[in-house]
Every structure is written in structure tokens, then in C-alpha cells.
Amino acid sequence: MAKEPARVKKRERKNITSGVAHVNASFNNTMITITDAQGNTISWSSAGAMGFKGSRKSTPYAAQMAAEDAGKKAAEHGVKTLEVNVSGPGSGRESALRALQAAGMTITTIRDVTPIPHNGCRPPKRRRV
């Protein structure tokens, strides 16, 4: 007797009006996660998840596409206002912010939460190209 295929539960719509967008812009990729005030993930996207590979993931355009995607997914759950936490040294920081605004989100605060060492670990040696 064949097993009946398991039914995939449809993701229910959360009615959340405000959230927190965490933009992590590294040198290699840009990741955007939109959470509620408690930190539970509502939606996420990254340059790699949008189909960019290799060095194209670190471009501002890839960050813009990822932010638009995360913003649209969050808007389906009712998110209208966002606080933005930006971390990392990558090139996709500003373009991700502009794309979130273009997706119809109202940005209330922008915080730079990049971790800065108080002379902690020794950094990697300089590249010689």
C-alpha cells in the first residue's frame, strides 16, 4: 500500500505592522532579515538566494534585489514600518536601505551595529595582488 504524501502546511499570515530589518553587508554577500520586535524572523533574503554567484553577490545591485525581495515578503505579513540595523563593511549597505524604502516600507531609525574591536584579535594579513 502506497504512503499518502505528507501535506505541506501553508505559511499563515502574521499581522505585524512594525519590524526590524537586519542588513548584514559582508565583503562577499549581503543578507537581509526582517524580524518582529522579539527577534522572530518574518522574512529573509540574500544576494546569493536571488541567484547571484561569486563576485556578483557583493555588488550594490545584488543587495538591492535582495532587499526588495525581503521587503515584499514582509509586506505580505502586514509590515509597514521598519527599524534598520546595518552591520558589516560591504558595498550593499546604502542600496539595501533605498530598496527597502522603494518596497513601500517606512524607515523609522537606522542604526549601525557593526562590531568594532577594542584591539581584540589580530586581523588577517594584507593581500598582495
Swiss-Prot record:
GO terms for molecular function: rRNA binding; structural constituent of ribosome. Keywords: Ribonucleoprotein, Ribosomal protein, RNA-binding, rRNA-binding. Part of the 30S ribosomal subunit. Interacts with proteins S7 and S18. Binds to IF-3. GO terms for biological process: translation. The keyword Ribonucleoprotein applies. The gene is rpsK. PROSITE patterns: RIBOSOMAL_S11. One of its GO terms (cellular component) is ribonucleoprotein complex. Pfam families: Ribosomal_S11. It comes from Caulobacter sp. (strain K31). Located on the platform of the 30S subunit, it bridges several disparate RNA helices of the 16S rRNA. Forms part of the Shine-Dalgarno cleft in the 70S ribosome. It comes from the Bacteria. This is Small ribosomal subunit protein uS11. InterPro entries: Ribosomal_uS11, Ribosomal_uS11_bac-type, Ribosomal_uS11_CS, Ribosomal_uS11_sf. Belongs to the universal ribosomal protein uS11 family.
